[in-house]
Amino acid sequence: SETGTGQSMYNIMDYTNTNITGTSLILERLLKSGNTIEHFILSSSRSIYGEGAYLSSNNQPVSKNLKRKIEDMKLGKFDIYCPETGNAMKAIATNEECIPNPLSFYAATKLFQEQQMNLYKEKLFRKLTIFRFQNVYGEGQSLNNPYTGLLAVFFNLANENKSLNVFEDGLESRDFIHVDDVVATIKCSIFSNNRSWDGTFNLG
């Protein structure tokens, strides 16, 4: 897949050709072959959730149509606000039942990949596992692409006594997962005969 939320907003055709058209070609070839795949694993992304889940003023989980307003951010207000009361809401864990709310073209392509695969699931796959990865890090990552190697970029800047530019109010949070843990989980899903791996899972 092409990856990177910011880049996707202006490299639209690159992301379309790779993430959407590429997936379409795989499905079309499988349909023409007449074969059924025992187990297919799709690498998706936590970005499909957008801002993720929040707790509203009446203590109800909210995830639908959440988006920070540009005018608020210009005033230094980076919270998500309750649509009913206007009060800042608290971020909570985002589970797999959270309503997707893609806020970038990249996220939209990953969600569409999931929909493509699920549409043909009964016809093509005996078992379909979709992993929605958090930020994956590990040895060998690119030091030039901040979308794939943020920790490596920060480490190298700190090692060179350079400033780490963190925007907003410094209270941002990110969930990271090491590539070894990703590989271990994928291997577990591959070598397990358990049908519980037939579904969609957050990983990170």
Predicted region positions:
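Short, electropositive, low-hydrophobicity segments enriched in small/polar residues
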Residues: 10, 26, 54, 111, ...
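N-terminal Rossmann-like NAD(P)+-binding domain of SDR-like oxidoreductases, especially those catalyzing
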Residues: 1-134
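A general structural signal marking secondary-structure boundaries and capping sites
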Residues: 7, 30, 34, 52, ...
